[in-house]
Every structure is written in C-alpha cells, then in structure tokens.
Amino acid sequence: MKCYNPSAFVPMAVTLVTVIIYLGVFIPLLIIQETVPSAPDDPTLYNGLNLTEAWLDLQSLSDGYHPFNSRKNDDVRNWLLKRIGEILDHNQIQYSTETESATISETQIKSDFDAEAPESVPSPSNSNDGSAERYHEDLRARKESPAVTVFNDLRSNYSSNALTSIGVKGRKLGISTYFEGNNIICYVRGSDDEEGEWWKTGSVNSKGKVHGKGGVMVNAHFDSVSTGFGATDDGVGVVTALQLIRYFTTPQNVPQKGFVALFNNGEEDGLYGAKAFLSHPMARFVHTFLNLEGAGAGGRATLFRSTDSEVTRAYAHAKHPFGTVVSSDGFSLGYVRSETDYVVFRAEGYRGLDVAFWQPRSQYHTDQDDAKHTSIDSLWHMLSASVATTRSLTKDTGNTFLGPRGDDKVGKVSNGKGSDGVWFDIFGTVFAVFKLRTLFAWSLTLLIAAPLMLFAVSYLLNRQDKFYFFAGSIKAKGPEDEPISLGGWRGAFRYPITLIITCAITFGCASLINKINPMIVYSSPYSVWSMSASLFFSIFWFIMAGCNFVRPSALQRGYAFMWLFVFGWIILVAATVYEDRFKISGGYLFVFYEAAIFLATLIAIGEQFALPKKSTYVENSQLDHDGNQDSHHQAVMGTDGANGADEANASNEAGQEEDPEDNVNDLAVPHETTPLIGGGAPTQRSSISTTFANRYRQVVPESYDGPADHHDKKGHKKHPYGGEQDWSAKLPIWTWLVQYLLVGPFILIVVGQVGLFLVAALHQTGTDGSPLLLPYLVVAVFSILLLLPVTPFIHRLTHHMPTFFFLVFIGTLIYNLVAFPFSPNNRYKAYFQQTVDLDTGLNKVTIVGIEQYIREIIAYIPSAAGQTINCEENPRIRSGLSFCSYEGIAPRVVDNVVDGIPPEKGYTDWLTYNVTRVPNENKATFHISGLETRACILRFDDPFSEFKVHGGAKTEERWDDVPDSGSDQIKLWSRDWNKEWKVDVEWAVGEDMKPGEEGRTGRVVCLWSDANERGVIPALDEARRFSPDWTSVVKLMDGLVEGSKRFVV
C-alpha cells in the first residue's frame, strides 16, 4: 500500500487539510452564532447580583403591553419606583427621593447615631479630644449626603423637530415635537464625588463645572411598543439597570465615580425620554454611558456601536464579549435606518457604548418579545457584560474621560479626547480593541511595503536566474539548438478568468432567487448560504481542475496568490481611503486578508530559490535531448548494449542508486517493436553512447543528472507532479501547507464571524421595506470571501468534495425556489393601523407590507370579506411597502358608548378642539383635548414656521423648534391623561400676500395605543385571531388608532 507524505501537495493531503480547517472553524462559529453562554448555576455567584431576582423582575415587567400612551405604562413606572426602593432597603442604603423641584428626604435605615457608631469610636461623654464632635459631624454629613438619590423626574421636557423619519425618502419638511418626560433617575454617589446636593448649584444648562471625576450612566427605556411585551426591548436592559443599582449599593462594590441609572420613558416613539433627560441637572454629571437596547428578541447581546476605542476597552473586560465594528459602520454609512438612545447621548458629547440584542428580528416588536421567547442565559449575557463594563468605567479615575474635548465643540461635556476605534471578538471569548489610526498605519504600510518586498524578492530571483514566473522559451548555447520552453506562462490567466466567471454565476443565482422567491432568506438563511457557497466551490473546482488536467502547471498556486494579492491590494486602497476620510473601521477585514495573502505570495515566490538556474536547466535539458538522440542512433545502427551495460555497472559501483525499472529499460536490446524515439522512460537519460555522436557531444558537468532526475536527501528520485514542468520536481513539497495555514484559520474566523453577523442582522429586514436583494448579495460576497482561501489549492482536491457540494447546490436551489418563506417560528410582520374620521364616523384599517403577502393575510380576515382591497405606496411613512386598506370594525378606545349602540355615536367626544385666528396676522391658537390619551398631533397641509405650547418648559437651545424649511406636524406628548393643549402656531407670509390674508388647513389628530384589553380595538383583535399562523401583526405608527377632525383657519 502506497503511503502519502501528509505535507505533500497531493490531492489526499490537500483534501484532508481543507476539511479539517473549514470544519474546525465553522462548527465553533455556528455554535457561537446560535447559542448563548449558560448562566451560572448559582444565581448569587457574584456578590451584589441576584439572577433569579432579575428574571422574576423581567417576568413582572413584561406581563403586558406598556407603550408610553397606555395606562400600563404608568403601572410599570410605579413598579420601578417600588423596586428601586426595595433594592435599596435590602442593601440598607440611606437614600433620598426628589420629585419635581421639591426634595423629600426619606431615610431608609435607622437614624440612631449611637446604633450606627462603630465600637472603635469613643462616645461623646468620655472623650475630650474632639473626636466625638468630628464623629457627629461626619454622621451629619452622611445624613445630608445620602448614598443614593432617586429622581422622580416630572419636569424635564423636550421640544424640537426632526427633518426625517424612519423609512422616509426625500422628506424636506420637519416634524416638530413637544414632549413632557417622566423619567426615573437613580444616582449612586461615588467615593470621589462631591458631598451635598451639588446638582442644585448653577443653571441647568451649565457645562462649566465638573463634579468629581464625572459620572458613569447606564440607560434603558421602560416603555414598549403597543404590540410587543418588551421583554428584550427593553425589559432585559431595565432589569439589568436594577441589578446594577443592587450591585453598586452593596458595601463591597461602592463605585469610585458616581453611577447613574436612567430609566427613560418614550424611546419607542422618537427617543424622547433620552432627549428629555438632557435638560435634567444630572445630565451635567455624566461623562460616559452604556446604553442597553433590544433590536431582536434574545440570543447574545452585541456591541452595536462605540464612540471611541478608550471606552470600548471597558467592554473588553466582559467574559463573553460579542460584536464587531462593522455594525457601527452600518450606522455611520446610513445603511441602518433605525436608531437608539445612543445617538442622543453621542450628540450631547458623552462617550459610551450601545449594547443590544439583535436577533431574531421576526420577534422584534411582536407579541413574541416576551419572557417565554427569551432566556435567562440571554439576560445573563447582557447583565454580566454590563457589570464588567460599568465596573471598569467607575474605577477609571484618571484623565481618560476628563479634560478638553478633542473636537473643541462648545457646550459639550468636557470628557477628554477619544480616538476612533476598531474592535471585534474572536469566538465570543477574546475581544480585540485598537485605534483606527493604528489600522490606518497598518493599511498604509501594507499598501507600500508589500508590493516593494515582492518586487525585491522577484528581483533577487531574477538576478540568480531562478524567476520562473512569466518565463517563456530560452534558446540553448548551440547555434543549431532549438529553444527550450520553461512553461512559465502556463496557468498565468486561468485564475482571474475563473474567478470572474464563478462570481458572475454566484451573483446571478442570488438574483434568480430574489426574482422568484425573494423572501426565502427570511426563514432559511443557512439554505441560502449553502446554495451560494456550494455553487461557487463546485464551479470554481470544475474550471480550475479542468484547466490543470488539460495543461498542468506547477505555477498555478503561485499565480493564484499573485492575482489574489492584486485584487486585495485594490480593495485595500478603497478601505484605506474610507479609514482616513470617513472613519470607517470595517476595513480591518481586508487588512488582515491582504496581509495573509501577501505572506502566502511571498512564499510562493520565495520557494523558487530552491530551483536550479534557468540557464542550467536549459543546458541540462539540451544535454538530455542530445543523450536521447545518441541512444536513438545506436538503436538504428544495431549497436549492442555492452558499452551501456559497462557504464551502468560503473555507475552502480560508484554508489549510484537506480530504479529497477530504469535498469530494465536501459539494458533492453532494441528490436523491431522498440519505439523509434526515446528507447527508455521519457524522464530518464539514456546511458547508451553512439558511435556517430562525438562531433555533437558537449562537455557534461559532473553534477548533471538530467532535468528530471532530481533526488531527495535519501537518494530517491523526485518527479514533477502530474505532467507539470520538469523543473518543478525541485520545489519544496511543504510550502503549500504554510500558505494554507496563513490564509485559512484566522482569516476564516474573522471573516466568518462578520458574515454570519451581517446575514443574521439583515435576512429578516425585508418586511421593514429594506431592499430584498441586499441579504442575498451579502451572502454571495461572504461566500466568495470565505472560499477564496481554498481556491489556490482547489485543483488538488479530490473530486469527492465538489461532487458533494454540487449535489448540495442542486438540493438547496430547488428548496430556495419553491419553499414557502414563512413559518410560525419565523413569522411575517404585517403593520397595522386604524384611522377614524371623527367627523363622518368612517374608519379604515390599513395593513402594510409586501402586497403579495398582505392580500393573502387580509383574505383571512372576516370583516374584509367582499370588500375591494385598495393597495398603494406611501413613502412618506414607510418606503418599499404597500398600504392595503379596508373598512374595519369600529374601535372602542373611549368607553363612552353603552352596549348595543354603535360606537360611532360617541366619536364626537373622543376629540374636541377649538381654533382662534389672530386678526391681521398669520397666527392661530389651538385648544385640543382628547379622552383616554396623552398624545395628539396637529397636521397641516402646508408648512408653518413657529409654534409655542402654553405652560410648556423653556425650549432647549440645542434644538430648533421648527427647521428653516418649516414643519407640517406638531406632535404633542403629555405626562398627564386627558390634558388640554393650548398651542400657538404661526406661518410665513407668502409672496405678494399680506399678514392675515392666508390661512391654513389640516387635521387635529389624537392617538390611542393601549391594546391590553380585548375588545378595545376589535379590528386588531380580529387581525391577530384570524391571520395565518405565519403572520404577526405589529404597530405601524405611534398610535394603533388615530382619530381626527378637519380644521380650517
């Protein structure tokens, strides 16, 4: 049985190494992608944390829908205040509560000074050195400066506008907003913080004074959407913040820098809670932050974004870090259209992190965002990372987050100068963090030094006459000798041609799936992965192996690396430009990729130092040719083989080792069946001399053994593989393995993690109106990137692998073309809203999504039966989707109608308004009041220029109420129910018009979002009940129900 050298470049070894590398990388990657690290068995393993308590809190928090505009939201808020108090009581912490402008000190531990006094402190009666007086002064200071202050914030408001909305293209008019916040802020005093109520000094907007070393804030919003229970969006974040309060109020964990837990309300409707916080005095204290969010419904919590590398190093302390800077680049480049509170704090100048759940998106904002569909492991993953991050930030008492800002922006927090960073995890265990300018230096060095080094090595090879790449034919020294081909151009262009053809076919297949069954990736991303990767692999092998079979070349691997280097260099140029100009860090993939390819290419070129000089090879080839000619002449003239036998014997006596087969061929006596040319093996030199060859004979060097008679160290003959160039027999047989290890494992880990991350984030975004082709293109690109490392070696793989992958391609292609894309585990999201004209009593239910599936869903709804379903696009609200409407069951959001009477009879009372025009001016005053709501909107058909809410807080200078282009909406959010709004509105004077000559028209709208009680919004109940099990119904706009009346002024 023949044994193969495991390091030899032969099919069996290459196939085995390929299988080991790819399985060894992708099995762990898939496990990490689809699983979450287990929570500890002991729920109190970490001092100050209680995982069981956190899980019970999550179940309590997510037992109902609690959007801002719901009564349940008030219940959750009251529950949070109660839970904070219970945690502080449990830890025996002295704390105070501040509500509005009044301060209510509530000492929660025993106030008996003597009971608190340690035994080592002398009592006042027996001490004459003043220590007792100092002791009581300390106690009084501690009583005046409690360890914790809870702010029941009922006064922070926000007033501003937004020029764009999520999913809106080309919108130029603003949406003005007035929001009254009701956040909860818990401040845990740090050991380095100032004593007393320092937040009451100075003006609210003052940024000049720094208290202590600056504070560390954790933010989570406690409101949910109206169609989701908010377990991960953002219940896990809320209970994590509660546990952090518990942790930092444990005596062993008192922070050095102050810790702030912000429970903000109103994030889902426009990040309003975070914006309102900025007008609170505690906002002056925060320097760094950790924002906790949920854009999925479980799994691992990933590091979405970070402001700089310094603050990211705090997250690196997490036991199971997870994330890549590529996700941050997605926001920076505008590919991700949704936002979190992170963007508010970053704009304020804070330095911090955005950690969020990100999959599965099919459960995001649905009724499956509950405790049942998440896990205690996911909770622990976010909680443990948050503890590690905040603990590191609160211990950093140096100048990292202090001092003048790097951007010199006036009015921002003076929290030092941060540097753009690059970060990524490896197998969810190791977290790499470095500065973007370091990556830029690597990129620039690689762009300049790598080509120079390759040219230098090539030059040295050429000087030594050993550079076989691009070598053609060389003429021997004899005047009548024919040129001898080196075969250096063989296989030079097959790699780029194959790559172009294979990539085109792969992208074409992605377009085919997008054309026929575009949503299959929604539920079957791994089927799409398998199809794309198996297609690329099998086609690439077929072309390259076929070329190698027809025209073998020992340079094929080297040329492949050269072309990869050229392509990678071009891509790296673009990545370097983005690093420098746009601060995009995701190019680290290509830096690592190109560095590995460069080293592999260097080996491919450098291994030619082991080859003979080209001139020597040509000379030996000519001698071999002459020797064969001598043998031919002897055979023709009938010369016996005595002389040849004598030479063979002499050779054996000198210790030369010969192959037995060669002896047989050399000693055979020619006869009429002997071939006319080449009496011996084609690769062996004949030892038979000829009588008539003396005039043509050249001097034979002592070292000459023929062009193919190369020997290893043991004296065994080495032959070129599979008909490749004769000189290739002297190439090292092990260098391919080093090259594979360079371009294989680490590159596959880094690229594979990013590819899996991006596809998991994108494959269920089609229902949001995102481009349907995008996830298929991402899969195709990363399939190619992940398989490029094997392509230089692919012609040496056995046929078994491409055969298997071709069968995989056929099976997955058929499945992807014909399978239904949704299931109960991967439900299609249909967006719901009901609008009611309170003047006429007409109501309309609108279901939004991809028209093909929306019509199928509506067909299941009884009240829509027999109606003509009208579908149209509305890019002002959500682009890329169809809005299909029908007349639905009347809502009962206001309980003012007796059973048996049509609810339309009570519509008039749901919303009342009065508008008064100011004479001779383009001004009007609106009085608006809605029942069972705290959210109303003024929508204008034409823009206005200014507005003012009576009784509202002073407008923050950081925001404009109305943009220069004007606004056409005013959103009004109140912290109180059934509030009457008084709003002054002014609009610009038109051309050739005088003040007072122009009016305005529009609608007064109020919103209702509470769907906790069945029957309040029966159209929504009906849609949920009768829609197919592969569908979920989620909210479209701020209100599930909009009631409106027309106004003319």
From Swiss-Prot:
SUPFAM superfamilies, per the entry: Zn-dependent exopeptidases
Region of interest (Disordered), residue spans: 114-135, 621-686
Residue intervals annotated with topology Vacuolar: 33-438, 517-526, 579-585, 762-773, 823-1049
Disulphide-bridged cysteine pairs: none
Subcellular location(s) of the protein: Vacuole membrane
Biased composition (Acidic residues): 655-664
GO BP terms: proteolysis
Main location: membrane
Segments crossing the lipid bilayer: 12-32, 439-459, 496-516, 527-547, 558-578, 586-606, 741-761, 774-794, 802-822
Record-level GO cellular component terms: vacuolar membrane
Coiled-coil blocks: none
Keywords: Glycoprotein, Hydrolase, Membrane, Metal-binding, Metalloprotease, Protease, Transmembrane, Transmembrane helix, Vacuole, Zinc
Bias type Basic and acidic residues, positions: 622-633
PANTHER family, A to Z: METALLOPEPTIDASE M28 FAMILY MEMBER, VACUOLAR MEMBRANE PROTEASE
Name of this chain's protein: Vacuolar membrane protease
Lineage: Eukaryota, Fungi, Dikarya, Ascomycota, Pezizomycotina
